[in-house]
């Protein structure tokens, strides 16, 4: 497999930048900001990209923690890459081989799980290596790099897609750290991720005086008077009844799921006033848009019913409406060639020592070589596809969930996975994987490998007109077969009570205050 001169330059750039990329990854891991609240992370990327010569739009798509960076080396094709950087509440873990939250916080604060800290820096490494090679070898064309907040709620990409940020690309390169077998050190072939709808039901009790009023008194005079049940009761009823009815919402096939999260509840302490506000978020992950619409209709009807029973009104606010993904074999083949060139990540003795420390601190017997075997080998896309299809109905096109799928509807896209550090044995507590994703010795090998694959793939697209043509022809054919227009018809849901850090007289903390008992 021949490597071009430009690709060799990119590989050398990534190697030379090893220390800097490691420090950058550790910085974003430490920020660990959750969905829609990634202020420091987004600002860091914007500053860095501008310093590297990119034109950067902050707040792209109406999302304060999103951005779109562009750079051109003259007329030619443009290749897209991106960063994610949102963390997950209740996963706060320091970059150490034992269970410990980051300094000054409790385990309830946010932390990187899969980890998006390394996903984003891998994207940045691939981007800057490509730029360096384009400049050195006079390759014409451009690079577009988007900052994608709130992936954990499939937030930004449907919005960016609807507003045209992925239009006009010769190709989009989508990387994610491995999180499920057999998708490790490989490329998705035919079965891409599915659709997802997410919404917040906001129950509002702002006219409690109309519920059960009988004596004309301006307010209830005692705790024993009739009072509106209020927003908390509406939320509890919605939560419980939706769970009871879940099995009746869709046929029992396709690997769909419905999950929920309580965003806000009433503010009263021990008062006997009805709660004025409660918010419940649902995430519906399904193979098709039609399935998502069916579940949404059932939840809408249920929300109306419980609101009427509790003296409330209800509002539905969209968090995401995301389309299923389109495959592109030409792009998959192109990226698979680069994965074979780079190879799987390699962990040295120091990394394996830390992995064994994690095993011991999880109560496991340490392995001489603790690395999960799948992390050290490559698997061909067609072989991974065959394993994936074993548990799916033959007529099912899409499976599992991630919002990169909206990119596939606008540009030829390859979705690939490189091994993050994972251990033999188990099961392991969440802190173990989170720690492995934060310790530089264990996560840097993945960042190096993914950055190289991204750069080699981007340069292949830029240098090979035939490869671009094949990818575009297949994209147009598949889009004609399954053309779903953007579903996003809502603003970014940034105004809700999403988990976040706070600054008070007590200092910097999580919105749930840290205490010795937490």
Cite the ranges covered by each PLM segment.
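Acidic-enriched catalytic cores of C-N bond-cleaving enzymes acting on peptides and small amides
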Residues: 214-215, 221-273, 288-317, 325-372
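Acidic/His- and Gly-rich active-site-bordering loop/insert found
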Residues: 3-112, 117, 121-141
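Glycine/charged-rich beta-loop-alpha catalytic/anionic-binding loops adjacent to active sites
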Residues: 97-113, 215-220, 431-440
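A generic structural motif
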Residues: 87, 207-209, 284-291, 322-323, ...
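Buried hydrophobic packing segments
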Residues: 45, 122-130, 235-238, 242, ...
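Divalent metal-coordination and catalytic microenvironments
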Residues: 28, 49, 69, 81, ...
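Histidine/acidic-residue-rich, glycine-tolerant segments that coordinate divalent metal ions
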Residues: 88, 103-108, 117, 133-259, ...
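An extended, acidic, His-containing surface patch that forms the Zn2+-binding/catalytic region
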Residues: 322-518
